[in-house]
Protein backbone atom coordinates (compact mmCIF):
# COMPACT_ATOMS: atom_id res chain seq x y z
CA UNK A 1 0.00 0.00 0.00
CA UNK A 2 1.24 3.50 -0.84
CA UNK A 3 2.50 5.57 2.06
CA UNK A 4 0.28 8.41 3.22
CA UNK A 5 1.44 11.80 2.06
CA UNK A 6 2.02 14.29 4.88
CA UNK A 7 -0.42 17.12 4.24
CA UNK A 8 0.35 20.40 5.95
CA UNK A 9 -3.25 21.39 6.38
CA UNK A 10 -3.07 22.85 9.88
CA UNK A 11 -1.08 25.87 11.04
CA UNK A 12 2.20 24.94 12.76
CA UNK A 13 3.19 26.27 16.20
CA UNK A 14 6.32 25.62 18.30
CA UNK A 15 5.82 25.33 22.04
CA UNK A 16 7.66 23.96 25.05
CA UNK A 17 7.24 23.14 28.71
CA UNK A 18 9.17 25.37 31.13
CA UNK A 19 9.40 25.53 34.92
CA UNK A 20 11.30 24.34 37.98
CA UNK A 21 12.99 20.93 38.16
CA UNK A 22 10.64 18.10 39.29
CA UNK A 23 7.49 20.19 38.93
CA UNK A 24 6.24 17.82 36.22
CA UNK A 25 7.27 19.25 32.82
CA UNK A 26 8.16 15.88 31.29
CA UNK A 27 5.19 14.10 32.91
CA UNK A 28 2.89 16.74 31.40
CA UNK A 29 4.55 16.35 27.98
CA UNK A 30 4.02 12.56 28.17
CA UNK A 31 0.41 13.05 29.32
CA UNK A 32 -0.35 15.38 26.38
CA UNK A 33 0.93 12.80 23.87
CA UNK A 34 -1.00 9.99 25.59
CA UNK A 35 -4.33 11.82 25.70
CA UNK A 36 -4.02 13.12 22.13
CA UNK A 37 -2.90 9.66 20.93
CA UNK A 38 -6.20 8.24 22.17
CA UNK A 39 -7.90 10.70 19.77
CA UNK A 40 -5.58 9.68 16.92
CA UNK A 41 -3.75 13.03 16.98
CA UNK A 42 -0.35 11.97 18.32
CA UNK A 43 2.03 9.12 18.81
CA UNK A 44 2.21 8.31 22.50
CA UNK A 45 5.64 8.84 24.05
CA UNK A 46 6.36 7.62 27.54
CA UNK A 47 8.19 9.55 30.24
CA UNK A 48 11.44 7.59 29.83
CA UNK A 49 11.75 8.19 26.09
CA UNK A 50 11.18 11.94 26.50
CA UNK A 51 13.50 12.12 29.50
CA UNK A 52 16.34 10.40 27.62
CA UNK A 53 16.60 13.40 25.31
CA UNK A 54 19.24 13.14 22.59
CA UNK A 55 22.22 15.48 22.51
CA UNK A 56 22.28 18.14 19.82
CA UNK A 57 24.83 20.71 18.86
CA UNK A 58 23.78 24.27 18.12
CA UNK A 59 26.44 26.90 17.46
CA UNK A 60 29.10 24.74 19.11
CA UNK A 61 27.09 24.06 22.24
CA UNK A 62 25.82 20.64 23.28
CA UNK A 63 22.19 20.65 24.34
CA UNK A 64 19.88 17.82 25.36
CA UNK A 65 16.38 18.34 24.04
CA UNK A 66 13.39 16.10 23.45
CA UNK A 67 11.24 16.98 20.44
CA UNK A 68 7.69 15.67 20.48
CA UNK A 69 5.06 16.34 17.86
CA UNK A 70 1.31 16.16 18.10
CA UNK A 71 -1.84 17.72 16.73
CA UNK A 72 -5.02 19.18 18.09
CA UNK A 73 -8.16 19.59 15.98
CA UNK A 74 -6.91 23.04 14.98
CA UNK A 75 -3.11 22.87 14.84
CA UNK A 76 0.11 20.92 14.41
CA UNK A 77 2.56 21.36 17.32
CA UNK A 78 6.26 20.76 17.79
CA UNK A 79 6.88 20.58 21.53
CA UNK A 80 10.27 20.75 23.22
CA UNK A 81 11.11 19.47 26.67
CA UNK A 82 14.62 19.61 28.12
CA UNK A 83 15.79 17.37 30.96
CA UNK A 84 18.17 19.70 32.78
CA UNK A 85 17.93 23.34 33.78
CA UNK A 86 21.14 24.21 31.90
CA UNK A 87 19.61 22.67 28.77
CA UNK A 88 16.67 25.07 29.01
CA UNK A 89 18.93 28.06 29.40
CA UNK A 90 21.03 27.02 26.40
CA UNK A 91 17.98 26.13 24.32
CA UNK A 92 16.24 29.42 24.86
CA UNK A 93 19.32 31.57 24.33
CA UNK A 94 20.68 29.82 21.23
CA UNK A 95 17.23 29.54 19.70
CA UNK A 96 17.96 25.86 19.05
CA UNK A 97 14.27 25.47 19.72
CA UNK A 98 12.42 28.63 18.86
CA UNK A 99 9.25 28.75 20.97
CA UNK A 100 6.15 30.69 19.90
CA UNK A 101 4.66 30.10 23.33
CA UNK A 102 5.27 28.06 26.47
CA UNK A 103 3.41 26.04 29.07
CA UNK A 104 4.76 27.03 32.49
CA UNK A 105 4.44 24.08 34.87
CA UNK A 106 4.25 24.93 38.58
CA UNK A 107 3.70 22.29 41.28
CA UNK A 108 0.87 23.38 43.57
CA UNK A 109 2.69 21.57 46.39
CA UNK A 110 5.72 23.89 46.07
CA UNK A 111 4.59 27.08 44.42
CA UNK A 112 7.01 29.18 42.35
CA UNK A 113 10.67 28.20 42.85
CA UNK A 114 13.97 29.80 41.69
CA UNK A 115 13.91 28.19 38.22
CA UNK A 116 10.26 29.18 37.78
CA UNK A 117 11.43 32.78 38.02
CA UNK A 118 14.48 32.21 35.86
CA UNK A 119 12.49 30.58 33.06
CA UNK A 120 9.94 33.41 33.10
CA UNK A 121 12.78 35.95 32.86
CA UNK A 122 14.41 34.00 30.02
CA UNK A 123 11.09 33.80 28.17
CA UNK A 124 10.79 37.59 28.48
CA UNK A 125 14.39 38.20 27.33
CA UNK A 126 14.34 35.90 24.31
CA UNK A 127 10.91 36.93 23.08
CA UNK A 128 8.59 34.07 24.09
CA UNK A 129 5.60 36.37 24.55
CA UNK A 130 2.82 33.92 25.37
CA UNK A 131 2.65 31.71 28.45
CA UNK A 132 -0.11 29.37 29.64
CA UNK A 133 0.19 28.10 33.23
CA UNK A 134 -0.42 24.50 34.30
CA UNK A 135 -0.71 24.18 38.09
CA UNK A 136 0.34 20.57 38.55
CA UNK A 137 -0.06 18.09 41.45
CA UNK A 138 -3.25 19.82 42.67
CA UNK A 139 -4.50 16.36 43.78
CA UNK A 140 -1.81 16.40 46.50
CA UNK A 141 -3.05 19.65 48.07
CA UNK A 142 -6.08 19.18 50.33
CA UNK A 143 -6.94 22.84 50.73
CA UNK A 144 -8.21 24.72 47.65
CA UNK A 145 -7.29 28.00 49.30
CA UNK A 146 -3.63 26.97 49.21
CA UNK A 147 -3.92 26.35 45.47
CA UNK A 148 -5.54 29.79 45.10
CA UNK A 149 -2.55 31.29 46.90
CA UNK A 150 -0.08 29.53 44.62
CA UNK A 151 -2.02 30.77 41.58
CA UNK A 152 -1.88 34.31 42.93
CA UNK A 153 1.88 34.04 43.47
CA UNK A 154 2.44 32.76 39.93
CA UNK A 155 0.32 35.58 38.47
CA UNK A 156 2.27 38.18 40.46
CA UNK A 157 5.57 36.69 39.32
CA UNK A 158 4.46 36.83 35.67
CA UNK A 159 3.37 40.46 36.07
CA UNK A 160 6.75 41.29 37.59
CA UNK A 161 8.36 40.32 34.27
CA UNK A 162 5.83 42.28 32.17
CA UNK A 163 3.61 39.35 31.23
CA UNK A 164 -0.15 39.99 31.61
CA UNK A 165 -0.31 38.09 34.91
CA UNK A 166 -3.98 38.86 35.53
CA UNK A 167 -5.09 37.60 32.11
CA UNK A 168 -2.88 34.56 31.57
CA UNK A 169 -4.90 31.32 31.57
CA UNK A 170 -4.17 29.03 34.54
CA UNK A 171 -5.24 25.37 34.35
CA UNK A 172 -5.24 23.12 37.42
CA UNK A 173 -4.70 19.39 37.33
CA UNK A 174 -2.50 16.35 37.77
CA UNK A 175 -0.28 15.32 34.86
CA UNK A 176 0.56 12.01 36.55
CA UNK A 177 -3.13 11.10 37.05
CA UNK A 178 -3.82 11.92 33.39
CA UNK A 179 -0.89 9.72 32.39
CA UNK A 180 -2.32 6.92 34.57
CA UNK A 181 -5.64 7.16 32.71
CA UNK A 182 -7.86 9.10 35.15
CA UNK A 183 -10.78 10.23 32.92
CA UNK A 184 -11.30 13.53 34.77
CA UNK A 185 -7.62 14.45 34.39
CA UNK A 186 -7.65 13.41 30.72
CA UNK A 187 -10.41 16.00 30.25
CA UNK A 188 -8.17 18.58 31.96
CA UNK A 189 -5.39 17.86 29.43
CA UNK A 190 -7.85 18.31 26.53
CA UNK A 191 -8.98 21.57 28.12
CA UNK A 192 -5.33 22.69 28.49
CA UNK A 193 -4.75 22.07 24.77
CA UNK A 194 -7.92 24.00 23.86
CA UNK A 195 -6.57 26.92 25.89
CA UNK A 196 -3.14 26.67 24.20
CA UNK A 197 -4.93 26.64 20.80
CA UNK A 198 -6.84 29.79 21.72
CA UNK A 199 -4.30 31.78 23.71
CA UNK A 200 -1.02 31.27 21.85
CA UNK A 201 -1.37 32.99 18.47
CA UNK A 202 -0.26 31.39 15.22
CA UNK A 203 3.15 32.95 14.45
CA UNK A 204 3.78 35.11 11.42
CA UNK A 205 5.58 32.88 8.94
CA UNK A 206 9.18 33.77 8.13
CA UNK A 207 8.25 34.43 4.51
CA UNK A 208 5.79 37.13 5.60
CA UNK A 209 8.38 39.13 7.56
CA UNK A 210 10.45 41.95 5.99
CA UNK A 211 13.24 40.69 3.72
CA UNK A 212 16.66 40.14 5.32
CA UNK A 213 19.70 38.33 3.93
CA UNK A 214 23.10 38.29 5.67
CA UNK A 215 25.82 38.66 3.03
CA UNK A 216 28.22 35.71 2.98
CA UNK A 217 30.10 36.35 -0.23
CA UNK A 218 30.51 39.11 -2.81
CA UNK A 219 31.78 38.82 -6.37
CA UNK A 220 31.51 40.77 -9.59
CA UNK A 221 30.31 39.57 -12.96
CA UNK A 222 32.01 41.48 -15.78
CA UNK A 223 29.55 43.64 -17.64
CA UNK A 224 26.71 42.88 -15.23
CA UNK A 225 27.76 44.17 -11.84
CA UNK A 226 28.10 43.04 -8.26
CA UNK A 227 26.49 39.94 -6.77
CA UNK A 228 25.92 39.45 -3.03
CA UNK A 229 25.14 35.90 -1.98
CA UNK A 230 23.80 34.36 1.21
CA UNK A 231 20.92 32.54 2.81
CA UNK A 232 17.69 34.49 3.08
CA UNK A 233 16.91 34.77 6.77
CA UNK A 234 13.33 36.00 6.42
CA UNK A 235 10.90 37.47 3.92
CA UNK A 236 11.04 37.25 0.14
CA UNK A 237 12.86 39.11 -2.62
CA UNK A 238 12.18 39.42 -6.33
CA UNK A 239 13.81 41.08 -9.31
CA UNK A 240 13.06 44.81 -9.27
CA UNK A 241 12.84 45.08 -5.47
CA UNK A 242 14.63 47.95 -3.77
CA UNK A 243 16.98 46.86 -0.99
CA UNK A 244 19.29 48.51 1.52
CA UNK A 245 22.81 47.33 2.30
CA UNK A 246 23.14 47.74 6.07
CA UNK A 247 25.87 47.19 8.66
CA UNK A 248 29.55 47.87 9.47
CA UNK A 249 29.22 51.52 8.29
CA UNK A 250 27.02 54.29 9.63
CA UNK A 251 25.63 55.07 6.17
CA UNK A 252 23.17 52.83 4.40
CA UNK A 253 23.52 52.07 0.70
CA UNK A 254 20.41 51.75 -1.47
CA UNK A 255 20.18 49.50 -4.51
CA UNK A 256 17.81 47.53 -6.70
CA UNK A 257 17.93 43.78 -7.30
CA UNK A 258 18.35 43.32 -11.06
CA UNK A 259 18.81 39.56 -11.05
CA UNK A 260 18.49 36.52 -8.78
CA UNK A 261 20.17 33.13 -9.03
CA UNK A 262 19.94 29.91 -7.08
CA UNK A 263 22.05 26.83 -7.94
CA UNK A 264 23.22 28.70 -11.06
CA UNK A 265 19.68 29.03 -12.35
CA UNK A 266 17.79 32.29 -12.56
CA UNK A 267 15.04 32.77 -10.02
CA UNK A 268 11.94 34.99 -9.99
CA UNK A 269 11.43 34.98 -6.25
CA UNK A 270 13.75 34.06 -3.38
CA UNK A 271 12.25 33.24 0.01
CA UNK A 272 13.33 32.51 3.59
CA UNK A 273 15.70 29.53 3.63
CA UNK A 274 16.92 29.89 0.03
CA UNK A 275 20.62 30.35 -0.74
CA UNK A 276 20.67 33.00 -3.45
CA UNK A 277 22.91 35.40 -5.32
CA UNK A 278 21.43 38.87 -5.82
CA UNK A 279 22.71 41.11 -8.61
CA UNK A 280 22.77 44.70 -7.31
CA UNK A 281 22.38 47.74 -9.55
CA UNK A 282 24.94 50.55 -9.31
CA UNK A 283 27.00 48.97 -6.55
CA UNK A 284 30.78 48.50 -6.72
CA UNK A 285 32.43 45.29 -5.57
CA UNK A 286 34.14 47.25 -2.74
CA UNK A 287 30.88 48.68 -1.39
CA UNK A 288 29.46 45.39 -0.12
CA UNK A 289 31.23 43.07 2.32
CA UNK A 290 30.55 39.88 4.23
CA UNK A 291 28.83 40.71 7.52
CA UNK A 292 26.47 43.30 6.07
CA UNK A 293 22.85 42.47 5.32
CA UNK A 294 20.54 43.11 2.39
CA UNK A 295 17.20 44.22 3.76
CA UNK A 296 13.85 45.69 2.88
CA UNK A 297 14.31 49.49 3.06
CA UNK A 298 13.73 50.87 6.56
CA UNK A 299 13.31 47.45 8.18
CA UNK A 300 16.62 47.26 10.09
CA UNK A 301 19.14 49.81 11.38
CA UNK A 302 22.71 49.66 12.62
CA UNK A 303 23.52 49.87 16.31
CA UNK A 304 26.65 49.74 18.42
CA UNK A 305 25.23 49.36 21.91
CA UNK A 306 22.89 46.64 23.11
CA UNK A 307 21.98 44.44 26.05
CA UNK A 308 22.36 40.71 25.54
CA UNK A 309 21.11 37.64 27.36
CA UNK A 310 24.09 35.29 27.15
CA UNK A 311 25.10 31.77 28.09
CA UNK A 312 28.85 31.38 28.72
CA UNK A 313 30.19 27.93 27.89
CA UNK A 314 31.69 25.85 30.67
CA UNK A 315 35.25 24.58 30.46
CA UNK A 316 33.93 21.06 29.65
CA UNK A 317 32.02 22.50 26.68
CA UNK A 318 35.22 23.97 25.29
CA UNK A 319 34.67 27.41 26.78
CA UNK A 320 36.92 29.57 28.92
CA UNK A 321 38.72 28.12 31.92
CA UNK A 322 38.63 31.39 33.89
CA UNK A 323 36.03 34.04 34.72
CA UNK A 324 35.85 37.41 32.95
CA UNK A 325 35.14 40.90 34.25
CA UNK A 326 33.80 44.20 32.90
CA UNK A 327 35.85 45.60 29.99
CA UNK A 328 36.41 42.08 28.60
CA UNK A 329 36.77 42.49 24.79
CA UNK A 330 35.82 39.37 22.83
CA UNK A 331 34.37 39.21 19.30
CA UNK A 332 30.64 39.09 18.69
CA UNK A 333 29.71 37.02 15.66
CA UNK A 334 26.56 38.53 14.11
CA UNK A 335 25.09 37.08 10.89
CA UNK A 336 28.34 36.28 9.09
CA UNK A 337 31.11 38.29 10.73
CA UNK A 338 33.03 38.96 13.95
CA UNK A 339 32.92 42.45 15.48
CA UNK A 340 34.93 43.29 18.60
CA UNK A 341 32.93 44.69 21.49
CA UNK A 342 33.48 45.78 25.08
CA UNK A 343 31.37 44.11 27.78
CA UNK A 344 29.98 45.97 30.75
CA UNK A 345 28.59 43.75 33.50
CA UNK A 346 25.45 44.82 35.41
CA UNK A 347 25.61 46.36 38.89
CA UNK A 348 26.29 43.77 41.54
CA UNK A 349 27.87 41.29 39.12
CA UNK A 350 31.61 41.39 39.59
CA UNK A 351 32.58 38.53 37.31
CA UNK A 352 31.10 35.85 35.09
CA UNK A 353 32.13 32.21 35.48
CA UNK A 354 32.20 29.63 32.69
CA UNK A 355 28.77 27.89 32.70
CA UNK A 356 26.86 31.02 33.86
CA UNK A 357 24.10 32.85 32.09
CA UNK A 358 24.11 36.62 32.40
CA UNK A 359 22.65 39.83 31.00
CA UNK A 360 25.31 42.36 30.03
CA UNK A 361 25.74 45.50 27.92
CA UNK A 362 28.00 45.50 24.86
CA UNK A 363 29.49 48.38 22.92
CA UNK A 364 30.70 47.28 19.47
CA UNK A 365 33.61 49.00 17.72
CA UNK A 366 31.65 48.94 14.42
CA UNK A 367 27.91 49.29 13.91
CA UNK A 368 26.02 46.06 13.16
CA UNK A 369 22.60 45.45 11.60
CA UNK A 370 20.85 44.13 14.71
CA UNK A 371 17.50 44.27 16.50
CA UNK A 372 15.84 42.74 19.54
CA UNK A 373 15.97 38.98 18.99
CA UNK A 374 19.13 38.90 16.84
CA UNK A 375 21.24 35.88 17.78
CA UNK A 376 25.02 36.02 18.18
CA UNK A 377 27.95 33.98 19.43
CA UNK A 378 30.76 35.30 21.63
CA UNK A 379 34.17 34.24 20.31
CA UNK A 380 37.77 34.47 21.37
CA UNK A 381 40.43 33.78 18.77
CA UNK A 382 37.93 31.90 16.61
CA UNK A 383 36.66 29.71 19.47
CA UNK A 384 33.07 29.99 20.67
CA UNK A 385 32.95 30.95 24.35
CA UNK A 386 29.29 31.93 24.58
CA UNK A 387 25.96 32.30 22.80
CA UNK A 388 23.48 35.09 23.16
CA UNK A 389 20.48 37.00 21.93
CA UNK A 390 19.94 40.77 21.80
CA UNK A 391 17.38 41.57 24.49
CA UNK A 392 17.40 45.37 24.12
CA UNK A 393 18.92 48.03 21.85
CA UNK A 394 20.68 50.67 23.96
CA UNK A 395 21.78 53.46 21.64
Swiss-Prot record:
Mg(2+) binds at residue 26. Pfam families: GTP_EFTU, GTP_EFTU_D2, GTP_EFTU_D3. Residues 19-26 are annotated as: G1. One of its GO terms (cellular component) is cytosol. Residues 81-84 are annotated as: G3. Residues 10-204 form the tr-type G domain. Monomer. PANTHER family: ELONGATION FACTOR TU, MITOCHONDRIAL (PTHR43721:SF22), ELONGATION FACTOR TU-RELATED (PTHR43721). Belongs to the TRAFAC class translation factor GTPase superfamily. Classic translation factor GTPase family. EF-Tu/EF-1A subfamily. GTP hydrolase that promotes the GTP-dependent binding of aminoacyl-tRNA to the A-site of ribosomes during protein biosynthesis. This is Elongation factor Tu. The gene is tuf.
